[in-house]
Amino acid sequence: MIIFPAIDILDGKCVRLFKGDFNKTTVYENDPVKTAKDFESQGSKYLHIVDLDGAKNPLNRQSEIIKRIALETELNIQTGGGIRSEEQIKDYLDNGVSSVIVGSMAAVEPEKAKGWIKTFGKERIVLSLDVNIVNNEPFVAAYGWQGSSGKNLFDLINGYTLQGLRVLCTDISRDGALQGPNIDLYKNVLNKCPGVELQASGGVAGLNDLIKLKETGVHGVIVGKALYERKFTLREALSI
């Protein structure tokens, strides 16, 4: 299981949101490049970066900071936030980013996302399908979690009909809350969507959460606030 330490960039700083709410922001570091290098020095080979400015307003993307991180580290970087075009994806991939995270377009315009997967390869595209649980059913959010696609998570994933499809799934109600991950959600995804390469995100509060996630068979897990709040060290997480 891959551990992805997370950097969320807002106004050029490293922040965490509480349950996806832009009005509930905590600034942890002023320099995302330094933070990325710190993660690398602790042994990480992977990094997850979310451009919250881009997610909120695609015209205000923080792509130059992200490209600097790719240039100045050896990290395998996956990044997204406000990705709306093939040109944006190509720009990141041409500048050292390993894979690009497609969020709203994956839910709202799946045919366009399928085209990008065909163009760049499934190993270079990660679909970020973030959900709100309504009556025990996961529905996919869109547009920086400020809207809903109205689509069921399992139906949407299976609509891609691709073995090895890379999917990052966040339970929004757990994100930044340190309340533990939604283990049942990830078990259900792996059960109902065979062949998916799943990354879990949201709620990790302790090393035991990582152990539980590993037991589900997820391919990777995003760890953010727990690291910034020093619930455990990155070295400890990488040892699991």
From Swiss-Prot:
Catalytic residues (positions): 8, 130
Any single biological process term in GO: L-tryptophan biosynthetic process
InterPro entries: Aldolase_TIM, His_biosynth, HisA_bact_arch, Isoase_HisA-like, Isoase_HisA-like_bact, RibuloseP-bd_barrel
GO molecular function, one term: 1-(5-phosphoribosyl)-5-[(5-phosphoribosylamino)methylideneamino]imidazole-4-carboxamide isomerase activity
Catalytic activity line of the entry: 1-(5-phospho-beta-D-ribosyl)-5-[(5-phospho-beta-D-ribosylamino)methylideneamino]imidazole-4-carboxamide = 5-[(5-phospho-1-deoxy-D-ribulos-1-ylimino)methylamino]-1-(5-phospho-beta-D-ribosyl)imidazole-4-carboxamide
Alphabetically ordered keywords of this record: Amino-acid biosynthesis, Cytoplasm, Histidine biosynthesis, Isomerase
Localization annotation: Cytoplasm
Enzyme class: isomerase
Keyword Cytoplasm: yes
Entry GO terms, CC: cytoplasm
Involved pathway(s): Amino-acid biosynthesis; L-histidine biosynthesis; L-histidine from 5-phospho-alpha-D-ribose 1-diphosphate: step 4/9
EC code: 5.3.1.16
Family label: Belongs to the HisA/HisF family.
NCBIfam families for the chain: 1-(5-phosphoribosyl)-5-[(5-phosphoribosylamino)methylideneamino]imidazole-4-carboxamide isomerase (TIGR00007)
Name of the protein this chain belongs to: 1-(5-phosphoribosyl)-5-[(5-phosphoribosylamino)methylideneamino] imidazole-4-carboxamide isomerase
Organism, as annotated: Elusimicrobium minutum (strain Pei191)
